[in-house]
């Protein structure tokens, strides 16, 4: 793509910059892992998006962070594999496909399983294509030659092998348990598929009569329809109010069934009446109580949420219709004594919106305790553990693992990995295997499929060729280096990948887990359809470009924190890119057809040259260090400050002196430094803004085909000059102070004014004298005086900088009262700074723990502030004379 054009287009247009570049990168195969044994591998597997539709801002954020990591590592010389892929997303995709069929007046049952699955695969192909297009728009450097899908044959083989091995170890079993049931889609749900909403409900207070006629016992419920399945009433064993009733029975109202009063510590004595109804088939806690007391389980609902024959006269009613009818009957019977309004959290299906029913069902489960134990033990091994960033999320993860429940893995769906279990038609024998039974005609396969998270848990190694442990990619690229994901799926995905990785590969699936938060709107609200505050990343890209969106997303929050999305801030980033574009145009217009090999940094350098090269070194160090710590925000801010302030606002302006001067050697050195600094800066910025940096870099003198594979900048000690940097800081302080004073008294820079500088000592005097051309160029004095023994002139505006005092005699413009007030404000500022730094230095904890260089830096600040404060005091005293 080598550019023959000398200059960039006059205006920055993100659409024309980004157009065609991604395809050019793909054709160059810059994103494909090479397997080069001389290079260290670096692997990330993308968290697979669901093939259900568009990617949202959360995906854009998540994948941008991964792209930053992989682009950086590629430039640092690693053999990078960033493996793309997508998730079949069982219930989500099936719901979408069924919805589409309903529009045609068809149900999945009309089609049958095989035909329905054909429709689901058609959906997958269509939406997988959309997702790839969106990845391209964001600019993601993915290795498409290794793209995977959770229902690919290789991944399906891995799923079956894992299921069979866990079953053979006794870690997968089939049993009756309470699960989250969606009556609308008629399937079990994982906890993450249940959305809890605050809804207005009620406590229904009822009197259950004691069977012996001696009275009644009062209790309350929010789900009266489940009382039809009650098999006990429970009290706390230490509750003196009810001890005499333990062992007695009550008669279940309406139903007439006699049920026992039992004692169980599950009951909270101080909550309500201290009495709870126990419905083992319709509540997870009641299920556990029922197991402890060997209570029967009476299921009173059908899978569609209607009442069944066990509900007696309510048989066939919808559960909520039953509630109304039952409440009416209870009132008429005198059993219902109060309906108390009550706001409470109710689970809803993420997919259908239906109220989720705790429901007794025969399902397949993974026995979690032995698997979790290994994962917990891993975190005690410093060299082998998974590192969470930020580290506070490790405790979140461990707490969940320590209190883990068995995992329900079966789903009543058609789209997904069908459970590899068969039941003998005559004997009922269960066969579990990776292959179907030889006499298949005598067996029926389990109709259910596995929870989507079951296959997702194998993603880091199934995508690399496992269970073939000799697969080249598995041997080279596993375990992976980093996982980037949101804190909302630590439990449901991260934890499961860790214990499955340990169980089947013997090692952690990834070294680091970088946790980010959620994307929220400017008011801090979660983006949702109901609020109408969602933003399509493709719309952001169309308006401001991928580079602007990426830079905002990656620098807008710290690790682990939520991100407040602001279109205004994306626009500000676009303005930043526009500034880079204009600065690059200036550099390119002054290259004079310079070739890459002609860049020469050995010539004599000005203080500005030495300073910008030193600042570049500092920026390279800061960006690299922060990238290694996943502090993308800090890295981005370092780049922003260097580019905007140091390079654009100061160095480019100072470079105009030699560029427009007569000294040819100085011109050549300045051109070389401009080319070198812009080249290195574009490389540092490339992971954040891949499109515009490639475009600019292609116009610069360069070697190599693409910036994507250009070497990452490293600190060059031969270009480090801290003394020159200090000199430049003094010049910048002087120029900035003069500009501020002129602004205060409305004196334009074009108007020449007298300027006097009192140097602190001979060394400062020598510096300022040597660099006086910069002061004359940027301060525009009619006369410049620099001495060590100057007396402050009357009616002069004053500024105090490190090592010098500035005086601008503006007799006609100065107001002594205003100048006095200004200096008093300065004095107050230095008083606070002195107090702050002295408080820090008097803190024994700080002095004991901080590195010597940091303490020395604070002492230098203290001395500087003391000197500046004294100079301000002296100037105030002079004004009083």
Curated annotation (Swiss-Prot):
What's a BP term from Gene Ontology annotated to this protein? valyl-tRNA aminoacylation
Q: Which domain of life is it from?
A: Bacteria
CDD domains xref list: Anticodon_Ia_Val, ValRS_core
**Compartment list:** Cytoplasm
Q: Name one GO cellular component term.
A: cytosol
What Pfam families has UniProt attached to this entry? Anticodon_1 (PF08264), tRNA-synt_1 (PF00133), Val_tRNA-synt_C (PF10458)
Location of the motif 'KMSKS' region: 526-530
Q: Which residues form a coiled coil?
A: 810-881
Q: Which residues of the sequence carry a binding annotation for ATP?
A: 529
What EC number(s) is this enzyme filed under? 6.1.1.9
Q: Which Gene Ontology molecular function entries are recorded, alphabetically?
A: aminoacyl-tRNA deacylase activity; ATP binding; valine-tRNA ligase activity
Identify the PROSITE patterns for this entry: AA_TRNA_LIGASE_I
Broad class of enzyme this protein falls into: ligase
Q: What's the stated role of this polypeptide? A: Catalyzes the attachment of valine to tRNA(Val). As ValRS can inadvertently accommodate and process structurally similar amino acids such as threonine, to avoid such errors, it has a 'posttransfer' editing activity that hydrolyzes mischarged Thr-tRNA(Val) in a tRNA-dependent manner.
- Family per similarity comment: Belongs to the class-I aminoacyl-tRNA synthetase family. ValS type 1 subfamily.
Name of the molecule in the record: Valine--tRNA ligase
Species per Swiss-Prot/TrEMBL record: Bacillus anthracis
The gene it comes from is valS
């Amino acid at each position: 793509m080598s550019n023959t054009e000398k200059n960039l287009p006059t205006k920055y247009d993100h659409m024309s910059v980004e157009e065609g570049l991604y395809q050019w990168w793909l054709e160059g195969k810059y994103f494909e892992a090479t397997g080069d044994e001389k290079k260290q591998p670096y692997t990330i597997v993308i968290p697979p998006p669901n093939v259900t539709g568009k990617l949202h801002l959360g995906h854009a954020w998540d994948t941008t962070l991964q792209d930053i990591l992989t682009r950086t590592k590629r430039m640092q010389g690693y053999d990078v594999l960033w493996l793309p892929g997508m998730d079949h997303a069982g219930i989500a995709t099936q719901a979408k496909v069924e919805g589409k069929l309903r529009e045609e007046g068809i149900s999945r049952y009309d089609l049958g399983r095989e035909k329905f699955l054909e429709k689901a695969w058609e959906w997958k192909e269509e939406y997988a294509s959309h997702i790839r297009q969106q990845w391209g728009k964001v600019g993601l450097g993915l290795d498409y030659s290794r793209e995977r899908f959770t229902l690919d044959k290789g991944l399906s083989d891995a799923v079956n092998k894992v299921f069979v091995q866990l079953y053979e170890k006794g870690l997968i079993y089939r049993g009756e348990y309470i699960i989250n049931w969606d009556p609308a889609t008629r399937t079990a749900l994982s906890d993450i598929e249940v959305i809890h909403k605050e809804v207005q409900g009620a406590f229904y207070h009822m009197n259950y009569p004691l069977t012996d006629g001696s009275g009644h016992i009062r209790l309350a419920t929010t789900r009266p329809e489940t009382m039809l399945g009650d098999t006990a009433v429970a009290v706390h064993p230490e509750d003196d109010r009810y001890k005499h009733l333990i062992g007695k029975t009550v008669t279940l109202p309406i139903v007439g069934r006699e049920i026992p009063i039992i004692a169980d510590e599950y009951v909270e004595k101080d909550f309500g009446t201290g009495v709870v109804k126990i419905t083992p088939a319709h509540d997870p806690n009641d299920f556990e109580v029922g197991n402890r007391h060997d209570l029967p389980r009476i299921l009173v609902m059908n899978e569609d949420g209607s009442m069944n024959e066990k509900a007696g006269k309510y048989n066939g009613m919808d559960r909520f219709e039953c509630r109304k009818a039952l409440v009416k009957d209870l009132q008429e019977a005198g059993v219902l004594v109060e309906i108390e309004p009550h706001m409470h959290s109710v689970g809803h299906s993420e997919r259908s919106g239906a109220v989720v029913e705790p429901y007794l069902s025969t399902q397949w489960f993974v026995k979690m305790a032995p698997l979790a134990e290994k994962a917990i033990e891993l975190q005690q091994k410093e060299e082998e553990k998974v590192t969470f960033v930020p580290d506070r999320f490790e405790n979140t993860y461990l707490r969940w693992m320590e209190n883990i429940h068995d995992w329900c893995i079966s789903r009543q769906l058609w789209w997904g990995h069908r459970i590899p279990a068969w039941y003998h038609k005559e004997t009922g024998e269960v066969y579990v295997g990776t292959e179907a039974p030889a006499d298949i005609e005598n067996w029926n396969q389990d109709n259910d499929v596995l929870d989507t998270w079951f296959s997702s848990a194998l993603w880091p190694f199934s995508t690399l060729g496992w269970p073939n442990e000799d697969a080249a990619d598995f041997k080279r690229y596993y375990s992976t280096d980093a996982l980037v994901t949101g804190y909302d799926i630590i439990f449901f995905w991260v934890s499961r990948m860790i214990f499955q990785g340990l169980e089947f590969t013997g090692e952690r699936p990834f070294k680091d887990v970088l946790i980010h938060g959620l994307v929220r709107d400017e008011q801090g609200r979660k983006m949702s359809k109901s609020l109408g505050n969602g933003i399509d990343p493709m719309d952001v890209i169309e308006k401001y470009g991928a580079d602007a969106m990426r830079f905002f997303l990656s620098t807008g929050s710290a690790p682990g924190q939520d991100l407040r999305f602001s279109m205004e801030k994306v626009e500000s980033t676009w303005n930043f890119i526009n500034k880079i574009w204009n600065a690059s145009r200036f550099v390119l217009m002054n290259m004079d057809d310079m070739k890459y090999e002609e860049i020469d940094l050995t010539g004599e350098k000005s203080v500005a040259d030495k300073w910008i090269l030193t600042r570049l070194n500092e920026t390279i160090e800061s960006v690299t260090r922060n990238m290694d710590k996943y502090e993308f925000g800090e890295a981005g801010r370092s780049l922003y400050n260097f580019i905007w302030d140091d390079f654009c606002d100061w160095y480019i302006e100072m470079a105009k002196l030699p560029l427009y001067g007569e000294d040819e050697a100085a011109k050549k050195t300045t051109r070389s430094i401009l080319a070198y600094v812009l080249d290195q800066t574009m490389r540092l910025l490339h992971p954040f803004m891949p499109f515009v940096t490639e475009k600019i870099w292609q116009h610069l003198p360069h070697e190599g085909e693409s910036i994507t594979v250009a070497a990452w900048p490293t600190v060059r000690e031969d270009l480090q000059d801290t003394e020159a940097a200090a000199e430049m800081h003094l010049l910048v302080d002087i120029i900035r102070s003069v500009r501020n004073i002129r602004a205060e008294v409305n004196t334009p820079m074009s108007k020449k004014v007298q300027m006097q500088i009192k140097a602190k000592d001979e060394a400062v005097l020598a510096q300022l004298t040597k660099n006086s051309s910069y002061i004359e160029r940027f301060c525009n004095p009619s006369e410049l005086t620099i001495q060590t023994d100057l007396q402050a002139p009357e009616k002069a505006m004053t500024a105090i900088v490190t090592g010098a005092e500035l005086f601008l005699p503006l007799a006609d413009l100065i107001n002594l009262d205003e100048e006095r007030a200004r200096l008093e404000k300065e004095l107050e500022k230095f008083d606070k700074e002195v107090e702050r730094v002295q408080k820090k230095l008097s803190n024994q904890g700080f002095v004991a723990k901080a590195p010597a260089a940091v303490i020395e830096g604070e002492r230098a600040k203290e001395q500087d502030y003391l000197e500046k404060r004294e100079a301000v005091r002296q100037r105030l005293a002079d004004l009083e004379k």
